[in-house]
């Protein structure tokens, strides 16, 4: 499954994996998964976290290692983001629910994920997605970026 990913995608997923893998031991635990999900405004129960881990935990050791994570991501990409998942993701970023993601909102979510970005990096991310040039990202622009990944 993961063999259909490009080198760029694998590098991106490696970066995402390290955001989850807080202690850097090469495995994601339910605790680490919970921390990241809560920082994104979700509130999963312990049982839900365990289910998520079990879904991809091929060797049954109770944690997700990078190859298992890659398989999960490859599967998720094949299902391509459903409209509902995209709306949910947009809502996570759009803190004030005004229909736009501002640079401040983008910075806030990325910082919660442990990703310290410079103002230039945040501005660059906005510029890449901001088709109409109004300095923020609307839902249509967000969908385009997410589908292009």
Curated annotation (Swiss-Prot):
GO molecular function: calcium ion binding
Record protein name field: Calmodulin-3
Positions where N-acetylalanine occurs in the chain: 2
A Pfam family of this chain: EF-hand_7
Residues spanning the signal sequence: none
SS bonds (residue pairs): none
Family: Belongs to the calmodulin family.
Binding site for Ca(2+) 1: 21, 23, 25, 27, 32
Function comment: Calmodulin mediates the control of a large number of enzymes, ion channels and other proteins by Ca(2+). Among the enzymes to be stimulated by the calmodulin-Ca(2+) complex are a number of protein kinases and phosphatases.
Residues bound to Ca(2+) 2: 57, 59, 61, 63, 68
Record keywords: Acetylation, Calcium, Metal-binding, Methylation, Repeat
Misc: This protein has four functional calcium-binding sites.
Cellular component aspect of the GO annotation: myosin II complex
Residue numbers of N6,N6,N6-trimethyllysine PTMs: 116
Keyword Metal-binding: yes
Superkingdom: Eukaryota
Coiled coil (residue ranges): none
Residue positions binding Ca(2+) 3: 94, 96, 98, 105
Protein residues bound to Ca(2+) 4: 130, 132, 134, 136, 141
Domain EF-hand: residue ranges: 8-43, 44-79, 81-116, 117-149
């Amino acid at each position: 499954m993961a063999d259909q990913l490009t080198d760029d995608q694998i590098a991106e997923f490696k970066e995402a994996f390290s955001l989850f893998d807080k202690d850097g031991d090469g495995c994601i635990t339910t605790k680490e998964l919970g921390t990241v999900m809560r920082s994104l405004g979700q509130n999963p129960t312990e049982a839900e976290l365990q289910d998520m881990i079990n879904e991809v935990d091929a060797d049954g050791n109770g944690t997700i290692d990078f190859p298992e994570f890659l398989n999960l991501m490859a599967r998720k990409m094949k299902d391509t983001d459903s409209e509902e998942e995209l709306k949910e993701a947009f809502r996570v970023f759009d803190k004030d629910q005004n229909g736009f993601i501002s640079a401040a909102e983008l910075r806030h979510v990325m910082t919660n994920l442990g990703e310290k970005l410079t103002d230039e990096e945040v501005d660059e991310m906005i510029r890449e997605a901001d088709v109409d040039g109004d300095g923020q990202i609307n839902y249509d622009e967000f969908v385009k970026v997410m589908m292009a990944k």
